[in-house]
Amino acid sequence: MPDRLPHILLCALALCCALAVGLPAAASAESTGGSVYVPPPPPAKRAKIVNGIAIPPVKAPARVKQAIEAANLIVRKPYVYGGGHTPYSAKIAKAAALDKGYDCSGTVSFALFGGKFLRSPLDSGSFMSWARPGDGSWITVYTNPGHAYVVIGGLRLDTSGGDRLAPEERRSGRGPRWRKYNRSPVGFTARHPKGF
């Protein structure tokens, strides 16, 4: 019996693991050759930053991906007060990315225009009554009369320079930049597009 004790303990442990991951009881270590299947984690709902560019989650809605792609066109542009507020049209959307710089609401507007959530740029005060109140599941604009930023797919798109937690974010300069860390929403109104 003492020689079989390690085998019995291993089988019991494998059975517990199988039950924990939802496998049928018959799928023990003995029936699977000593291994137990553990399913992969679900796909991430959070975008990733690679060399300053956001990579959208695979399962993100198409319009969310389009908003991220539009924002990627202006990332690394400098901060310019009033930048990004030229009226948009589908034909000049890419040309608008060639503005010399963007301010906070111009940055948010350009990303949202890319995802077909806006038809023309808004200033930060106008965003306070845009769309629906509260946090969205994919996109949330945080705004007050003096500043606006947006969180898309879990990443913050912001132009401000003083709240960066990571050293690489502090070195990135002012202007449209993706941030992996959120900032405090205190003093901001949260708005989101319906269904997003």
Regions found by a protein language model. Give the residues of each.
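N-terminal capping segments
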Residues: 30-105, 113-115, 136-137, 142-145, ...
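Bacterial N-terminal signal peptides that target proteins for export
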Residues: 1-12
